[in-house]
C-alpha cells in the first residue's frame, strides 16, 4: 500500500497538528459546568471546515450543539463519533500542571480532554486532511458526529438520532474509545457496556443540627450507608434481588474471543498502585470479569461537614452517586426497577432515587467491514495484531448509532490513549508520538474501509435503548 507520501505529510505537519490539539485543549468545555461550550463547538466546526468538510450545527432543545461534518463520496458511508465536552477537573491540587494549559512535558501533552477525547477528534480530522492531500479523493463517505454532552449521558444525541435517521444510516461506526495497554498493545473494541447513573438520597431533619441531637434524631448519613451496604457483598458481588438471574450467558463467539485476551496484571497493579484485584481474581477469570462482569460503583458520597476544621454536625441530607455498568440482557430501566424493589423490601422506601443518565449496551461482530478494516490497519501500523475486546468495559451513547430505529450498524472503537493517560483523573495526558502515530493509523483505516466488505450482518446486540434523562423514583 503506497503510504509513504501520506506518512511524510504527517511528519512534515506534526508540529501544526500538535498545535491544533493544544489550542482545542486550552478551551475549557466541561459540560457539567457549561462554561465555554459554544465557543468550543464553533472551533470544532471551523476545524472541520479547514479540512474540507461540509458542516452543520444541530441544537436539540436547550442542549449543547451537535456538530456534523461530512466528506468523501461513494455508496459506502461510515460514521465517526467524537465529543468536544470534557469531564470536570476535580481538585486542582492533584494536577502537576494547569488542566487547560496543554503543556508538553517529556513528550506528553497534559490537559483535561487530551485523552478523552479531543486528541482522537483532532487526529481524525488531521488524517482526513493528510489523505486528501496525498491520495486525493476519499474512497468512502465519512460522517463526523461530535457530541457536546457525552459527560451528561448524551440526552440530545438520542433525540437527534430519532429525528435524523438518514444521517445515521451507514455501513459501520467508528468510536473514540481505546488505548495501548501496559505492553504497548493497541486495544480495539467491538462494543460497549451499558450504563445506568443514579443518585441516591436520604433525608433527615429540616436543616443540619448540632450533633448533640444524635442520640434521638435519625441520621440520614447512616441511613444511606446502611442502604448502600445491601447492594453489594463485602467481596464486591452485586446482591440486588433478581439482578444476577437477568444476565445473559456469554456466547460461544465471545467465549472464544476472550481466550485471545490477556491483561498485564502486574503492570496494571503497578500503574494503579494496588496490591490485588477484587476477590483475588487472576488470569482468564480476571479478563472475563473485566469485560463481561456488571459493576456497581460508588462514584461519590456527600454529607455533613467535610471541609477543613472541626464542626460537630448532624447532617440533614446524605447523597451518593452510583454507576452500574451493564452486560447483555441488563437494561437501564431494569436496573432501576430492581434497585427500587430491592430497597423497598428491606425497609428503605424513604431512600430517593434520581436517574441522572443512562445508555444501552451495544456490541457487534468481528466480521463486519469496519471491524476488519480497523483490525487490519492496526496490525499494519503497530507491527502486530491488536487485542480485540468483544465489548469495552466503558460506556457511551453507542445505541444512538448502532441500534436506534433498528439501524443494524456495527461498531469498532480505538483511541490514542495509553495505560498512563488517566482520563477522568488528574494529570490526564497523551503521548505526542501516539497522537501522530494515530493519524497514520486512521489514514490506513480510511483506505481499508474502501476495500473491505462485511462477512456478517454486523450488529449482534443492543439492549434497552433509552434517552439519558433525569427522573425521580421514591417508594
How should these model regions be labeled?
Residues 2-112, 133-142, 322:
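Acidic/His- and Gly-rich active-site-bordering loop/insert found
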Residues 84-86, 145-154, 176-180, 204-207, ...:
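Acidic, glycine-rich active-site loops and adjacent beta-strand->loop/helix elements
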Residues 85, 231-235, 340-349:
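A common structural junction motif
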Residues 105-116, 384-388:
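Short pre-catalytic strand/loop immediately N-terminal to key active-site residues, enriched for Gly-Thr
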Residues 109, 115-191, 455:
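Acidic/histidine-rich catalytic neighborhood of metal-dependent amide-processing enzymes
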Residues 182-183, 239-317, 325-338, 346, ...:
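An extended, acidic, His-containing surface patch that forms the Zn2+-binding/catalytic region
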Residues 187-203, 411-418:
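Flexible glycine/proline-rich, aromatic-decorated loop/lid segments
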Residues 214-236:
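A short core secondary-structure module
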Amino acid at each position: 500500500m503506497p503510504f509513504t507520501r501520506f506518512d511524510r505529510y504527517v511528519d512534515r505537519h506534526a508540529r501544526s497538528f500538535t498545535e491544533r490539539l493544544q489550542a482545542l485543549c486550552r478551551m475549557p468545555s466541561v459540560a457539567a459546568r457549561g462554561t465555554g461550550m459554544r465557543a468550543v463547538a464553533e472551533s470544532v466546526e471551523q476545524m472541520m471546515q479547514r479540512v474540507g468538510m461540509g458542516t452543520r450545527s444541530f441544537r436539540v432543545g436547550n442542549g449543547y450543539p451537535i456538530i456534523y461534518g461530512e466528506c468523501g463520496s461513494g455508496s459506502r458511508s461510515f460514521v465517526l463519533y467524537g465529543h468536544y465536552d470534557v469531564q470536570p477537573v476535580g481538585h486542582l491540587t492533584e494536577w502537576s500542571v494547569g488542566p487547560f494549559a496543554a503543556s508538553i512535558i517529556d513528550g506528553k501533552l497534559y490537559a483535561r480532554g487530551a485523552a478523552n477525547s479531543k486528541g482522537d477528534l483532532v487526529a481524525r480530522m488531521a488524517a482526513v486532511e493528510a489523505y486528501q492531500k496525498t491520495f486525493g479523493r476519499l474512497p468512502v463517505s465519512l460522517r463526523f458526529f461530535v457530541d457536546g454532552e457525552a459527560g451528561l449521558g448524551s440526552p440530545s444525541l438520542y433525540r437527534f438520532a430519532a429525528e435524523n435517521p438518514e444521517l445515521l444510516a451507514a455501513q459501520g461506526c467508528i468510536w473514540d474509545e481505546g488505548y495501548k495497554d501496559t505492553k504497548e498493545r493497541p486495544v480495539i473494541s467491538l462494543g460497549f457496556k451499558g450504563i445506568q447513573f443514579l443518585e441516591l438520597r436520604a433525608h433527615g431533619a429540616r436543616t443540619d443540627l448540632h450533633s448533640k441531637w444524635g442520640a434521638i434524631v435519625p441520621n440520614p448519613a447512616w441511613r444511606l450507608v446502611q442502604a448502600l451496604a445491601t447492594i453489594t457483598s463485602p467481596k464486591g458481588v452485586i446482591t440486588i434481588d433478581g439482578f444476577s438471574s437477568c444476565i445473559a450467558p456469554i456466547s460461544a463467539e465471545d467465549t472464544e474471543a476472550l481466550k485471545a485476551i490477556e491483561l498485564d496484571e502486574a503492570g496494571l497493579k503497578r500503574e494503579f498502585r494496588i496490591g490485588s484485584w477484587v476477590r483475588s481474581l487472576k488470569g482468564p477469570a480476571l479478563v472475563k470479569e473485566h469485560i463481561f462482569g456488571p459493576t456497581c460503583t460508588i462514584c461519590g458520597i456527600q454529607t455533613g461537614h467535610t471541609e477543613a476544621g472541626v464542626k460537630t454536625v448532624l447532617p440533614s441530607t446524605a447523597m451518593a452517586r452510583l454507576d452500574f455498568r451493564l452486560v447483555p440482557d441488563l437494561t437501564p430501566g431494569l436496573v432501576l426497577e430492581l434497585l427500587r424493589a430491592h430497597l423497598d423490601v428491606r425497609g428503605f422506601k424513604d431512600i430517593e432515587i434520581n436517574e441522572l443518565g443512562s445508555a444501552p449496551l451495544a456490541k457487534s461482530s468481528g466480521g463486519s467491514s469496519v471491524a476488519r478494516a480497523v483490525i487490519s490497519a492496526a496490525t499494519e501500523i503497530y507491527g502486530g495484531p491488536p487485542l480485540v475486546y468483544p465489548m469495552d468495559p466503558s460506556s457511551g451513547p453507542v445505541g444512538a448509532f448502532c441500534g436506534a430505529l433498528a439501524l443494524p450498524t456495527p461498531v469498532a472503537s480505538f483511541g490514542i490513549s495509553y495505560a498512563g493517560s488517566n482520563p477522568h483523573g488528574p494529570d490526564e495526558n497523551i503521548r505526542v508520538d501516539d497522537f501522530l502515530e494515530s493519524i497514520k493509523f486512521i489514514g490506513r483505516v480510511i483506505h481499508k474501509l474502501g476495500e473491505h466488505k462485511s462477512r456478517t450482518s454486523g450488529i449482534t446486540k443492543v439492549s434497552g435503548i433509552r434517552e439519558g434523562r433525569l427522573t425521580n423514583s421514591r417508594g
